[in-house]
Amino acid sequence: LDGIVGAEGMVIHAALGRAFVAAWDRRAGAAGRLEAGAIWGYDLEAGAAPRNLTPELSFPFHPHGLGLLAQDAGGILMVVNHRPRGDTIEVFTITEAGLKHSGTVSGDLLKSVNDVVPVAPDRFYASLDHGAPKGFQRMLEDYLRLPLSGVVYYDGAQLRPVADGIAYANGINLSPDGGKVYVAATTGRRLHVFDREPFEGGLTPRKEIFLGTGVDNIDVDGAGNLWIAAHPKLLSFVAH
């Protein structure tokens, strides 16, 4: 889509015929120009130019992954935000006019957050793509494909770890019945499948599916099929 720089993730609200795209020019940030990112809305039927739905937020906004809890006339959008003082999950309500910011979740466990999937208006799972701090240790984690990352769960009141031992936890999503959580392990080149406990939110490993490529974002269609983006050249991905 023209006009969108640095797209990190996309979700589609089928009932509204609308796509939401999280974008942030991270290369500009690396060059010292910390420009604000945005959530863009795109009408899949009209095909008009995408529209910035977050032009006047009152806080730094550098989005990464995002997740949708759809309802017929709207729903909830949760977005990973890399604020200068730490990662947060921003919660937006979908309205006829666009998006309304309705809350922020922060906490010490939200470090190196990559993606998020909501399971209720106030509950979510988030993937943490690294366990090591930035610098040499993180470089070793990437190039040695060390399984130091994981998943945290927010129950509406507090965060807690629910999965670990994953090599670069990236995209995360939910099965249509809510019974399984899928996590893409980019440097592990596999998909982790967990059984989900619906009341407490705990995850139990079910299986790992080796895919032989650097898996990234996961989309689940209405029939339960998984559509997974991938980076076949892992060294190029890690260098990026």
Residue ranges of predicted features:
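Surface loop/turn motifs at the tips and blade-to-blade linkers of beta-strand repeat domains
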Residues: 1-3, 53-59, 104-109, 161-167, ...
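Beta-strand-rich domains and repeat architectures in extracellular enzymes and scaffolds
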Residues: 1-37
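Beta-rich catalytic cores
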Residues: 6, 35, 62, 85, ...
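Blade-loop segments of beta-propeller domains
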Residues: 8, 26, 32-80
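Residue-level detector of Asp-centered blade-edge/turn motifs that repeat once per structural unit
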Residues: 13-16, 69-74, 118-121, 176-178, ...
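Short, conserved, GDST-rich strand-edge loop motifs in beta-rich repeat architectures
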Residues: 21-36, 80-81, 126-146, 229-240
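Asp-box/WD-like beta-propeller blade repeats and closely related beta-sheet repeat scaffolds
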Residues: 57-65, 69-70, 74-138
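Loop/turn-rich, solvent-exposed surfaces of beta-rich toroidal or solenoidal domains
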Residues: 212-240
